[in-house]
Design a protein with these regions (language model features):
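Single conserved hydrophobic/aromatic residue that forms the stacking wall/gate
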Residues: 1-14
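Extended recognition patches within non-cytosolic domains
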Residues: 69-77, 86, 226-267, 498-500
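Short surface loop/edge beta-strand patches of beta-sandwich-type extracellular domains
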Residues: 91-115, 162-169, 241-247
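Extracellular glycan-interaction surfaces
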Residues: 71-96, 117-127, 142-205, 229
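Chitinase-like catalytic core of GlcNAc-active glycosidases
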Residues: 13-85, 201, 265-400, 490-493, ...
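Glycan-binding loop/region signatures in secreted carbohydrate-active enzymes
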Residues: 46-47, 60-82, 264-267, 276-277, ...
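Aromatic-rich beta-strand patches that line glycan-recognition/binding surfaces
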Residues: 65-70, 117-118, 127-139, 191, ...
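Flexible glycan-contacting loops in extracellular carbohydrate-active proteins
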Residues: 198-223, 248-253
Length: 514
C-alpha cells in the first residue's frame, strides 16, 4: 500500500490501520475506449483506484500487451526527410531489413483470423520475391506478403498456402496499398480505389499463432511511408495520416510514420503511449489515486498450473511495475472453476505477493460463482473486487448484491478486504449494452432497473439502486466499490452519472458532519 495517499477526497483503506474510515472507489480503464474519448479526465479523477487493463500472460509466464510496443530495429535502412513529394520516409536497398519485433499477428488469446496491413510504397526496382512483410519459423513460412515474378503481381502466403493478385501499375511513383485478410479471404486496395481486388487461391482460416518477429522489407528496393498493421479489416485506413480518435483506428496494432529521423522505427501506437496520455489527463485532477496495471485473459490457466511459469510471471510483473511506475497490479482472470484451478490461482497470488513484497498494492477480481481461493491467498491480497453483476440477470438486483457479499464474508473474506462490484451496463442475459447508451437513448427515470433499448429489454442498475448499494457498503463497513467500467457510464459531469452517485455517498459517509 502507499501510505502517503491521504487527502480530503481520498478513500483508501490502509491495510495496516483498518480503523481508518474511508472507502475505495475503484474502476477500470480500457485503453481503446479512453483513446476515443469515452473516458474523461473528470471521471478518472473521481476514482481513488484506477486499473489500466493492458496485459495478459503467456503459458510460460511471459507478459504480453494487448497493444504491443513495436519500435522497429533498422538494418541498412536509411531515413529521407523528403522523397518524391512525401516527407519522412525510409529507404530499403535490397539488403535492408526492418524488424518490428515479435508482438504482431499472434496473441496469448489465440490466433488471428483477420488483419490489415497498409503502407505507402515507392518501388525503385521490381524484385521477384521481395518481402513487404514476413513472419518465419526457421525456414518455414508463417505468413508472407511478397512481390511476384512479374511486375504488378503480389502474393500472400500463409503456411504452405499461396494466393496471388494482379494490381494496377505500381512500378512508378508512390502508391498506397492496403491488404486485408479475413478467414481465408484476402483483398487488396490500391490508391484511392474503394473497390478491392480479390486474391486468387485458397488460404487457411487463420494465421498460425506462432510468436516470431514481424520483418519488413527483406530484399525490397524502394521506399515506404505510413506503414500500419491492424486487427480489423480496414484496408483503406492508411490513405490519410492516421489519428486515433475512432474505434477502427483504436485497433491498429502498429503504426510506423517514419517522421523522426533519430528514431525512424518508432511505433506511434502502443499501450505505453496510452498510459502516458492517461497520466497526462490525470495531472489536472484533485486528490490522490493509484494507477495500476490490470492483467486479464491470455493463457492464464496454463501459466498458473506451472510453478516455473508462475515464478516467471511474478518476476515480469514486478519489472513492469517498476519500469513504468505503476502503483500496483490487479488480476482479472475469469475464473477458476474447480479445485485444481483454485489451488493454482491461490499459488499464483501467493507467489506474486512474495515477489512484489508488502508495499506494492495487489488485488484480484473474483465473482460470486468463483471466489473460494485459499485463506493464505486472501491474506496476500490488499483487497478482492467482487463482481456482483452478470453475466446472469439475477446478479443485478440489490437483494442479490447483499446476499453475495454475505456469502463471501461467511467464507472468510474480511469486509475490509471486500470491494463490492457494481455494473455500469445492462444485460438481457445474452446481450449487453452500456448504461450511457440508455441515457443517450432517452432514459428518463432514476429508479427503474429495466430499459428497452433497440427492441431488447435490459436489466441494469439505476441511479437509486447504485445509491442504495453504495450506502449499504458504507453502513456495513465494506472496503468500497468497484465499477465496470468507466467507458460505459455517462460522464461524471452529467447528473445521471452512476459514478457521481458513488462518489457523493462515499464523501458523505467519510465525512458525515460536513
Amino acid at each position: 500500500i502507499m501510505p502517503s495517499l491521504v487527502g480530503s477526497e481520498m478513500c483508501i483503506r490502509d491495510r495496516d490501520n483498518p480503523t481508518v474510515k474511508s472507502f475505495i472507489n475503484c474502476s477500470y480503464i480500457r485503453g481503446d475506449f479512453f483513446e476515443i474519448n469515452r473516458i474523461s479526465a473528470a471521471s478518472m479523477g473521481a476514482c481513488t483506484d484506477l486499473i489500466y487493463l493492458a496485459a495478459r500472460p503467456y503459458a510460460n509466464g511471459e507478459v504480453a500487451f494487448e497493444l504491443p510496443l513495436n519500435d522497429a530495429t533498422m538494418t541498412n535502412v536509411s531515413h529521407a526527410g523528403t522523397f518524391q513529394g512525401r516527407n519522412g520516409v525510409v529507404k530499403f536497398e535490397g539488403t535492408s531489413l526492418m524488424n518490428g519485433g515479435d508482438g504482431l499477428l499472434h496473441s496469448a488469446d489465440g490466433a488471428f483470423n483477420k488483419f490489415s496491413f497498409g503502407t505507402y510504397i515507392y518501388i525503385s526496382e521490381w524484385v521477384d520475391g521481395a518481402f513487404l512483410f514476413k513472419k518465419m519459423d526457421g525456414n518455414s513460412t508463417i505468413i508472407a506478403f511478397q512481390m511476384g515474378a512479374t511486375a504488378n503481381s503480389l502474393k500472400l502466403s500463409i503456411g504452405s498456402s499461396v494466393a496471388t493478385v494482379t494490381t494496377p501499375d505500381l512500378a512508378t511513383g508512390w502508391h498506397y496499398i492496403g491488404l486485408t485478410y479475413e478467414q481465408g479471404t484476402a483483398k487488396l486496395y490500391v490508391d484511392t480505389n474503394n473497390t478491392a481486388i480479390s486474391f486468387v487461391g485458397a488460404l487457411p482460416n487463420e494465421v498460425p499463432n506462432t510468436r516470431t518477429d514481424f520483418l519488413i522489407g527483406d530484399k525490397f528496393k524502394g521506399y515506404l511511408d505510413e506503414t500500419f498493421v491492424s486487427s480489423l479489416v480496414v484496408g483503406t485506413s492508411g490513405r490519410n495520416p492516421i489519428t486515433f480518435d475512432n474505434w477502427n483506428n483504436s485497433k491498429i496494432l502498429a503504426y510506423w510514420k517514419y517522421d523522426d529521423a533519430t528514431k525512424p522505427g518508432k511505433d506511434s501506437h502502443s499501450w505505453l503511449g496510452r498510459l502516458n496520455n492517461i497520466r497526462t489527463a490525470l495531472q489536472g485532477q484533485q486528490g490522490d489515486r493509484r494507477l495500476r496495471l490490470g492483467i486479464a485473459g491470455g493463457e492464464w490457466k496454463k501459466m498458473m498450473a506451472d510453478a516455473t511459469a508462475r515464478t516467471r510471471f511474478a518476476s515480469e510483473v514486478k519489472k513492469i511495475i517498476e519500469q513504468y511506475d505503476f502503483d500496483g497490479v490487479d488480476f482479472d482472470f475469469e475464473w477458476p472453476t474447480n479445485a485444481s484451478e483454485y489451488n493454482n490461482y491461490s499459488a499464483t497470488v501467493i507467489q506474486m505477493r512474495s515477489t512484489l513484497g508488502k508495499y506494492v498494492y495487489f488485488t484480484a477480481s473474483l465473482h460470486p460463482v468463483s471466489f473460494k481461493i485459499s485463506p493464505e491467498a486472501i491474506d496476500a491480497l490488499d483487497f478482492i473486487s467482487y463482481q456482483c453483476y452478470g453475466p446472469a440477470v439475477m446478479r443485478f438486483p440489490y437483494e442479490q448484491f447483499v446476499k453475495d457479499g454475505e456469502a463471501a464474508v461467511a467464507y472468510g473474506i474480511p469486509k475490509n478486504k471486500l470491494v463490492m462490484g457494481v455494473p455500469f451496463y445492462g444485460s438481457t442475459g445474452s446481450l449487453i449494452a452500456a448504461y450511457c447508451d440508455f441515457v443517450n437513448d432517452g432514459l428518463a427515470t432514476t429508479n427503474e432497473d429495466t430499459y428497452t433499448y433497440k427492441g431488447n429489454t435490459y436489466t441494469f442498475n439505476s441511479i437509486e439502486t447504485i445509491r442504495k448499494k453504495a450506502r449499504y457498503v458504507c453502513e456495513e463497513d465494506y472496503a468500497g466499490i468497484m465499477s465496470w467500467d468507466l467507458a460505459t457510464d455517462i460522464d461524471i459531469t452529467n447528473n445521471k452519472s452512476l459514478l457521481k452517485v458513488i462518489k457523493e455517498e462515499f464523501e458523505y459517509y467519510a465525512n458525515p458532519t460536513e
